[in-house]
Structure formats: structure tokens, C-alpha cells
């Protein structure tokens, strides 16, 4: 099933400079040095297939810096882990948190619908990004929808592959970039905005603290 899906869009992605890696990731390195990744996630459970298409913007250089600060946060004595966690679990959690190079990820494609398009209309023409089926015969226009996913992904990559977008739309990468270019006022504004809605405010405050210490 995975090969059937990737074969259907291989030519379109190849024309845009992408190569297929590990059988499920279409990737290309842009002029900025960042990597654009389109992933076909498909699994089979109890006889039916589950498909989820995702997009990722990767920057190993940027995230190495971000993850170095994050590791300081996760090892800070002020950062609290559940009391029941053994040291091995803490270490494995830290390793997992500081090893990924993803700056931004798209998992819900509904945000890509046209400005004047209703959610119902979008779902009617493009719902394959998250779909369960027994066979592709249940999705008569699956090839056309996959082609649409290529078009939408290229538009998304164009929009997110800038420092300005990252600073305005991400969390730790944004703070790291703003700090790196000494944009103090913008850094504080972004930090306050993120802190107000942070699911883990303690972690956000510690990241800001260690970021400032690194700058000093």
C-alpha cells in the first residue's frame, strides 16, 4: 500500500526536486538550507488501513542550538519531573526531546483551505490527508487527491521557509532566532505571547532564562 501511494506522486515530487527516502519521506533541501519533508504515514490495523499525510520543515543547524538550550532546561534543578519517574525514564525523555530537527510540522491540512472556502467544501474535495479505508477502491479520486496534496504541500513549504515566518509562528525556534539577532523587544513580545498560552509555563520560563544566560 505504501509503495502504491508514493508511486502515485513520485513524478510530481521529483519534478519539484524531491527524492524519496526510507520509502515514505519525500525530501528536498531548499536554497535556505532547510529541508522540506512530506511524509506518507500508513498502517494497517484489524484489516483496514489508516493514512495520515504530514509535512515538516527541518533545520538541523537551528535546532541544534535550540536543543542545546532545551537540554539545559530539562536538566535544571528547577524543572520538575513526576516523582514516580526513575532516572532512566528522565534520561530517555531528555534524549527524545533534544534529538529532533523539526522546526515546524503540519498535521492538520484543514488550515490550508482557501480563504473563502468552507470546511465542508474543503473536506469534500480533499480528505485523504487523514483517512481510514479497507481498500483504495473506496476512495475513487485518491490519485487526484494525492496530486492536490503535492500542490498544497509546495505552497506550505514556500510560506514557512523564512526566518520571518519561523519567528512569528513557532515557539522555541522563534525565541532562539530573535535572541540570536539581538531583537530584544521582539523577543520579549514573542515570549510573553507564548507564555500566556504555554501548556508548560515552567518550561517556557526556564527556556527564556537559559536563552538569556547563553546570550550573556
Feature-to-residue mapping (PLM):
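Intrinsically disordered, low-complexity regulatory regions enriched in serine/threonine/proline
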Residues: 1-6, 27-216
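A short acidic/basic microdomain associated with nuclease active sites
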Residues: 17-31
Amino acid at each position: 500500500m505504501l509503495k502504491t501511494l508514493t508511486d502515485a506522486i513520485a513524478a510530481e515530487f521529483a519534478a519539484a526536486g524531491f527524492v524519496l527516502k526510507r520509502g515514505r519521506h519525500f525530501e528536498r533541501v531548499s536554497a535556505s538550507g532547510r529541508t522540506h519533508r512530506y511524509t506518507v504515514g500508513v498502517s494497517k490495523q484489524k484489516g483496514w488501513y489508516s493514512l495520515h499525510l504530514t509535512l515538516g520543515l527541518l533545520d538541523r543547524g537551528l535546532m541544534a542550538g535550540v536543543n542545546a538550550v532545551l537540554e539545559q532546561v530539562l536538566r535544571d534543578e528547577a524543572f520538575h519531573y513526576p516523582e514516580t519517574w526513575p532516572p532512566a525514564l528522565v534520561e530517555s525523555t531528555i534524549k527524545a526531546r533534544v534529538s529532533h530537527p523539526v522546526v515546524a510540522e503540519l498535521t492538520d491540512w484543514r488550515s490550508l483551505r482557501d480563504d473563502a472556502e468552507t470546511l465542508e467544501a474543503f473536506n469534500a474535495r480533499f480528505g485523504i490527508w487523514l483517512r481510514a479505508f479497507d481498500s483504495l477502491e473506496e476512495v475513487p479520486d485518491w490519485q487526484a487527491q494525492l496530486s492536490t496534496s503535492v500542490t498544497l504541500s509546495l505552497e506550505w513549504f514556500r510560506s514557512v521557509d523564512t526566518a520571518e515566518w519561523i519567528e512569528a509562528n513557532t515557539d522555541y525556534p522563534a525565541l532562539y532566532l530573535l535572541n540570536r539577532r539581538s531583537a530584544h523587544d521582539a523577543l520579549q513580545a514573542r515570549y510573553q505571547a507564548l507564555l500566556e498560552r504555554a501548556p508548560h509555563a515552567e518550561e517556557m520560563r526556564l527556556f527564556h532564562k537559559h536563552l538569556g544566560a547563553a546570550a550573556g
